Design a protein with these regions (language model features):
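Alpha-helical interface subdomain recognition
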Residues: 3-159
Length: 159
């Protein structure tokens, strides 16, 4: 992989997924420690759903990132589209992790005592690095609407 926009965008996608995972880990730990009404807040359904949403977004974004890395490493003709998909999925996962992390932490999430604010700001800063969402969405839309995109799970590793 050389120094090109796709490599940069793929790198950012990986960083965003790592940030999302770290924000989820911090939120899970905090939900287990913080008590309200004599119980950990992680025992409440609303908190569980927030954390489950983030975990699901992360698990859905990982294979997209891996597929993009494979496409880029093997110089596939549509590697840029795969990278854009990974970039979008990773960005959504990191933003969801930040939003729900703040919900779980409450005001503590913004303080210097909790590292969540640092990871959240990093995710926000990386949001527009190596192409903003509009650029990546346009790239994916152009590919899908061109009719050249073989859609479906049977076409994942085909050219």
């Amino acid at each position: 992989m050389g120094a090109n926009p796709e490599s940069g965008a793929l790198s950012v996608a990986g960083q965003l997924l790592g940030l999302a995972q770290r924000m989820l880990d911090l939120s899970v730990d905090y939900a287990a420690q913080r008590k309200q009404f004599g119980k950990p807040i992680g025992s409440f359904q609303a908190v569980k759903h927030h954390l489950a949403d983030v975990a699901t977004a992360l698990e859905f974004a990982k294979p997209v990132l891996y597929r993009a890395a494979y496409a880029l490493a093997h110089n596939e003709p549509n590697a840029a589209v795969w990278v854009s998909q990974a970039r979008l999925a990773s960005c959504e996962a990191s933003w969801l992790a930040a939003r729900h992390g703040i919900q779980v932490h409450g005001a503590m999430g913004y303080t210097w005592e909790v590292d969540l604010q640092m990871f959240m700001k990093r995710a926000w800063a990386l949001d527009s690095a190596w192409g903003d969402r509009a650029l990546h969405k346009a790239r994916v839309a152009e590919y899908v609407l061109s009719g050249a995109a073989p859609l479906g799970c049977g076409h994942t590793f085909e050219d």
